[in-house]
Amino acid sequence: MKQASISRFFKKVSAVNKEKVDQVKEVEKEAEVDEVLDLTLDSENDEEQQQETPVLEPIDGEEHPTVSKVPDLNDSRLLQKQKILNASKDITNSVDVSAFNEKLKDIMNKRKLGRIKGSLIDESDEIAEQSEADEHNIKKKRKKSDQLTPLDRQVKDLKLGNMDKVLVIRVGYKYKIFAQDAIIASTILHLQLIPGKVTIDDSNPNDSKYKQFAYCSFPDVRLKVHLERLVRSGLKVAVVEQSETATTKKFDNSKAKTSVFERKITGTYSKATYATNCEFEVNHENILGTNNSIWALDIEVSDSIYKYYLWSIQLSNGEVIYDSFEESKDNFSKVETRMKYLNPSEIVSPVVDSFPIKLKKRFLDLQLCQKNYDILAEDLNIPKKELLNNRLIELWHILYRYLKEYSNEKLLNIGSNYRHFSQKISIQLQAQTINNLDLISNDDSKGTLFWILDHTRTPFGKRLLKEWLLRPLLSKDAIVDRLNAIDCILESANSIFFESLNQMMKGIPDLLRTINRVSFGKTSQREVYFLLKQLTGVIKHFEAHKDYIEVEINSNSGAIKTKSTKLASIMTQMFEFSLSSVIPQLLLMINVSAVMEKDQKKQLLGFFHLNNYDNSENIIKMQRDIDSVKAQLHDELQNIKKILKRPHLAYKDEVDFLIEVRNTQVKGIPSDWVKVNNTKMISRFLTPRTKELVELLEYQNDLLYNEISKEYDQFLNRIASYYNEVKTFIMNLAEYDCLLSLAAVSCNVGYTRPVFTDSNEQLIIAKQARNPIIESLGVDYVPNDIEMEKDSGRVLVITGPNMGGKSSYIRQIALMVIMAQIGSYVPAESLKLSVFDNVLTRIGSQDNILQGQSTFKVELSETVEIINSCTSKTLLLLDEVGRGTSTRDGNAIAWALIKYFVEEEQCPFILFTTHFTIVTTVKSPLLKSYHMNYVQHKNENENWTTVVFLYQLKAGVTDSSYGLNVAKLAGIDTHIINRAHDVAISYKNDTEFDTNMILFQKVRNILANRTTARETLKVLLELDV
């Protein structure tokens, strides 16, 4: 129906002049049908059609319409058709009618084939532009670049300056993506691609067939959805907006008149910057990019060593990390550890093309960007410059210039955000330890230690708790301070001050992310309001409990201060900020009703409470100018009433100021009145005077909008001037949130406060300890004791059947140490321990095909790294080392490794699980042997022994792994297991007297030569495996 309507319209446009009057009448009759049909122009706009439709701007490349403002979507369609009709009159005067007819037929054929999709606005643009091109082609042949429409020429200029970005450009109601960007976007967004030039520079041979760029488009209300999809696909996306309106273009004489609107980039987005730079309302916590960082990385490559220089910036929390470190060319554990901590999503580097292949394989999921900028004078003010080497300073400039592309460079100027990656006050857990112990997961799913500990109430508190977990404390005093604070919170939980504060924190959004967005000037009005409101709420809470704070917290004899200096310090700092903060005054300057409006333009226009805002003079003056124009429009209405002799006449609305007249009374209308639109019953008009005043009113409204936009930016700058104070306040609140979360953990049944020894001697002694992760999953976990001391049980060798609980046991010890050193209660009857300087693990069996490493190569590489990293205060978990190779080789490696450690002066605390019982033959007072207990029995028709796991640690060694029992549990047929049992017995008899085991013979030779354990291990590790 719609196609037929449009087809009839265009046929009438191409008719001879004597039919023009009839054509206009026919168009008017069809208007009502088209009003409905045009609402279905884009299937993606189904949900948004109910929203208020914005005013259409004039088409790029056309003259401005005679009416300054189109009242609504329905009326606009007819007006656009009338403009096409007027354009056709000019065309028929200068171009042969038959040629123009052919052009129209071609367009209609394309539409029938589904190759053109768009509104009458797009189509009128196309007719005008193509006919203009035809006219010029008649006069002379133009160059390819000159054949572009004014809009396409503007697109080309924008794209040439931003070749690394996908440009999403506003054109009227829609956003369009052109040329090569359109090819990519149409595939990702599943949008129809309109044929045209697919390259900006006409490098594609087929581009010569087209006069316009290929493009795809979507309604402006879908920008948020499509922008996030593009960014999730790993693209860097720039949004281009119109920076002027039709009215401003007409009245502003300071700029040269052009046929297109001025456009500029208003926002650039990537995975790491989306959360900070997006200007949409965010209704969920896990917005894209919240936890991602941007890296600037440089590498010095030598024959055997890579030296890394690193900057990392996390835009959501403002953290700036710097580091430099070395690794051997075949080892990337330090890089992987930093990736685990800092979670980069994009890396900028001057040497990306020179990255070693093995390193690039680790960055497969990241965006790599090669950049090398010249150092400019404006970049020279580097915070903490005295702590940086020359390579880091050069790399800082690259990061600064890169962030400037996103308008996020301001954070690099705040010295309080800087810190070195390796902090002496905490342990830097390695990536393999984090993975092997299931400390965290990328999606915060169940089955991790963080999932157990996380009872935080705020997003920024949650991030800080995760940082605490990955960085256990090294200072006993700092650990005890946290434990004391937890106890104090539990004892004070019933006080009105703490109870109210705890309830208030439940609804607080991500204030840390918001204050960083404010510093970038990227925040919506509603977001600013809620930032100030939430901060003011906490401030008012402290002010309301001033007496309690003075007596219980600030006083030296106060209950809080005597029990926990840490908790008292947090509360005191927050209280002092509350007394001096201007945040409540800034909140009063905001008009609450305006920021709750759905329309963003209304939010901005009404943002300031003018009675309270201290710089409202210009705004008030402009509002008076607008009121003056409206008064003149009402005066004009009185004249119109007299002309029409309708004393009760009123404007249709006070937006477009149209006069509605019944069609039966149209004959009495003055000839100079302009008909804007009509229906079957009425017609709407503008008088010459109202037309003039409406245009003036729009211009005044544009000036007001620009003025308030400037004032809003100044308001954000005013808030940002208190960035350090506000961030400190938020971080204090985050720290209290973490302590409150750990206090909730301490309430779990069977959890106890760990006790740290005053002596320097290392030990772990626990009664009835449990694995917190397995227990939390609903398993009835069997508790076990732990006893490891400096001179006895420093090395525990644990044997036992498969699935007997060996790995779970050693993991629970490491988990309890980490929990204790972040200041948490632990799952045990009691725990006494000393502070460990690291927790290292070698658990699991896996290969690394991408890096060309076998399972055993990975195992030995990690083992060598552990040997080089551990000290006498390190807790070391070794789970079945040697299982990645043959039994003989594995026996030898495991034995030599334990022999090496027990002879070392800096022997760490070791938990060693194995099926190689030869390890227990190592003689040393430091070593104790245990196994996981079980009972065994035989079933009928089964040659092998079936075991029942008791999961209890028992002194001594077990000589069988009972792997056939696991085969039964896995459902393997009994006949196969019986056969396997016979083979196992035969194999055992053959190997017991085998004196030709190569590696054992080498060990005997080494011992006979009285070599050291280190030399023994070195020989074994250098074997070709």
UniProtKB/Swiss-Prot annotation:
InterPro entries: DNA_mismatch_repair_MutS-lik_N, DNA_mismatch_repair_MutS/MSH, DNA_mismatch_repair_MutS_C, DNA_mismatch_repair_MutS_clamp, DNA_mismatch_repair_MutS_core, DNA_mismatch_repair_MutS_N, DNA_mismatch_repair_MutS_sf, MutS. Keywords: ATP-binding, DNA damage, DNA repair, DNA-binding, Nucleotide-binding, Nucleus. Residues 142-272 are annotated as: Mispair-binding domain. ATP binds at residues 800-807. Residues 41-50 have a biased composition (Acidic residues). The keyword Repressor does not apply. One of its GO terms (molecular function) is ATP binding. One of its GO terms (biological process) is meiotic mismatch repair. Residues 41-70, 127-146 are annotated as: Disordered. It holds the Pfam family MutS_V. GO terms for cellular component: MutSbeta complex. It is found in: Nucleus. Heterodimer consisting of MSH2-MSH3 (MutS beta). Forms a ternary complex with MutL alpha (MLH1-PMS1). NCBIfam families: PRK05399.1. Component of the post-replicative DNA mismatch repair system (MMR). Heterodimerizes with MSH2 to form MutS beta, which binds to DNA mismatches thereby initiating DNA repair. MSH3 provides substrate-binding and substrate specificity to the complex. When bound, the MutS beta heterodimer bends the DNA helix and shields approximately 20 base pairs. Acts mainly to repair insertion-deletion loops (IDLs) from 2 to 13 nucleotides in size, but can also repair base-base and single insertion-deletion mismatches that occur during replication. This is DNA mismatch repair protein MSH3. The lineage of its organism: Eukaryota, Fungi, Dikarya, Ascomycota, Saccharomycotina. The gene is MSH3.
